[in-house]
């Protein structure tokens, strides 16, 4: 996993935690920290989390490297 994918994964996790807080407690942590949902900084954070989610979408379609190595080493597993 590349560095950019790790950063995107962290941002996606932060976004998921924020959505959980909104769903369970009606508390938007990003808005509370950065000055409300309409502030420029909050919108930037929301945008970055959204882009990170799109980048992580590619992980769904990436083949498992460990499984590929096992299949290459042992062709009868297919």
UniProtKB/Swiss-Prot annotation:
Q: Which Pfam families match?
A: DUF378 (PF04070)
Q: How does it sit in the membrane?
A: Multi-pass membrane protein
Statement: the UniProt record of this protein carries the keyword Membrane: yes
Q: Name where it mostly resides.
A: membrane
Any stretches that span the bilayer, and where are they?
Answer: 7-27, 41-61
Keywords associated with the record: Cell membrane, Membrane, Transmembrane, Transmembrane helix
Can you list the GO cellular component terms from the UniProt entry? Answer: plasma membrane
Q: Where is the protein found, in the record's own terms?
A: Cell membrane
Name used for this protein in its record: Uncharacterized membrane protein YuzA
**Keyword Transmembrane tagged:** yes
Gene name per UniProt: yuzA
């Amino acid at each position: 996993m590349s560095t950019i994918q790790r950063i995107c994964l962290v941002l996606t996790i932060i976004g998921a935690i924020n959505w959980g807080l909104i769903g369970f407690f009606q508390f938007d942590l990003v808005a509370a920290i950065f000055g409300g949902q309409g502030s420029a900084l909050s919108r930037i954070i929301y945008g970055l989390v959204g882009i990170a989610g799109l980048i992580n979408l590619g992980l769904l379609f990436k083949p498992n490297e460990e499984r590929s190595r096992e299949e290459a080493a042992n062709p009868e597993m297919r």
